[in-house]
């Protein structure tokens, strides 16, 4: 009555063609990845060999890559000076003096000089905002208007009554 293997009806059955195809595709992808890894390892090995050959050749010729300036001085010497372990050499001091002598008048200008607001505001938007705030403060500080012909900048000293006394003041004015 039963007609055979019930496992053929299951989706996970390894004998089914669709499952065999999935397994084969995964194996192919893994093989391709392994091949790419091998190629990259060969490229890296070749690059290392070339660098070793160039390093041996460059030590005799002195080939420059453009980054030598970062490594020219001994960094520990600078640190020793900064930490107070070592004093400045006279050659360093002489170099600084020669540099000062070679400077033009324009380069001798103190770099801590005050930058005019006009130049500074062109570069910095917050400085522009600050100058506008300063201008507004200056505008608000207008002198007090003098009382009937007096020419003083002193604040008014006459008795100004609060608004709550408005009706009383109005009545006083009408009584005149």
Swiss-Prot record:
Q: Enumerate the residue ranges of region (Disordered).
A: 139-176
Q: Which UniProt keywords apply?
A: Coiled coil, mRNA processing, mRNA splicing, Nucleus, Spliceosome
Spell out where the chain crosses the membrane: none
Query: What the protein does?
Result: Involved in pre-mRNA splicing.
Q: Name one GO biological process term.
A: mRNA splicing, via spliceosome
Location of this chain's protein in the cell: Nucleus
Would the keyword Thylakoid be found if you checked this record's keyword annotation? no
InterPro entries reported in the protein's UniProt record = CIR_N_dom (IPR019339), CWC25_splicing_factor (IPR051376)
What is the protein name given in its UniProt record? Answer: Pre-mRNA-splicing factor CWC25
């Amino acid at each position: 009555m039963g007609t055979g293997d019930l496992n053929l009806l299951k989706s996970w059955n390894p004998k089914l063609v669709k499952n065999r195809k999935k397994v084969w595709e995964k194996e192919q992808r893994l093989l391709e990845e392994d091949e790419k890894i091998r190629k990259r390892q060969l490229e890296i090995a070749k690059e290392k060999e070339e660098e070793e050959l160039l390093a041996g050749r460059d030590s005799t010729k002195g080939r420059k890559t453009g980054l030598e300036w970062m490594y020219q001085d001994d960094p520990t010497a600078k640190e020793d000076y900064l930490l107070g372990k070592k004093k400045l050499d006279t050659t360093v001091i002489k170099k600084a003096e020669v540099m000062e002598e070679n400077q033009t008048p324009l380069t001798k200008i103190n770099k801590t000089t005050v930058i005019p607001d006009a130049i500074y505001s062109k570069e910095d938007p917050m400085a522009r905002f600050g100058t506008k705030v300063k201008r507004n403060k200056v505008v608000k500080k207008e002198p007090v208007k003098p009382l009937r012909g007096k020419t003083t900048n002193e604040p008014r000293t006459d008795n100004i009554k609060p608004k709550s006394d408005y009706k009383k003041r109005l009545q006083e004015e009408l009584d005149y």
